[in-house]
UniProtKB/Swiss-Prot annotation:
Name the record gives this protein: UPF0473 protein LSEI_0788
Family listed: Belongs to the UPF0473 family.
Pfam families in UniProt: DUF1292
NCBIfam families: PRK13678.1-2, PRK13678.1-4
Organism: Lacticaseibacillus paracasei (strain ATCC 334 / BCRC 17002 / CCUG 31169 / CIP 107868 / KCTC 3260 / NRRL B-441) (Lactobacillus paracasei)
UniProt-listed PANTHER family: UPF0473 PROTEIN CBO2561/CLC_2432, UPF0473 PROTEIN CBO2561_CLC_2432
HAMAP family referenced in this protein's UniProt entry, alphabetically: UPF0473
Length: 106
């Protein structure tokens, strides 16, 4: 289980450029980052910066090596290959989204 105490919502200025298999660059906004004690890793969840707020967005998730400031935008990103690790990331994302929805209703 991830340690939710370390969930950090993305800052407005935290953006990461990803390059796809065709060499195309796309700018992504950091949704949030978190640390997992179980896996000993940090994770970042991203969504395309070009998406508007009223559209459903595809969220990308990676483990990352933070820079000296703990920033995901300057560190190295790594794919998540383990199914159990994916399940943990999805659980944290669902909790984050549920918390965000409840805050909107307040």
């Amino acid at each position: 289980m991830a340690n939710n105490e370390h969930v950090t919502p993305g800052e407005d200025d935290q953006q990461i450029t990803l390059i796809d298999e065709k060499g195309n660059e796309e700018l992504y906004q950091v949704l949030f980052t978190f640390d997992s004690e179980d896996y000993g890793k940090s994770y970042v969840l991203l969504y395309p910066a070009s998406e508007s707020d009223d559209q459903e967005v595809e969220i990308q998730a990676f483990s990352f090596t933070p820079d000296e400031n703990g920033d995901a935008s300057s560190g190295d990103l790594f794919p998540i290959d383990d199914d159990a690790e994916w399940d943990m990331v999805e659980e944290v994302l669902n909790t984050f989204l549920a918390d965000d929805d409840s805050n909107l209703k307040d």
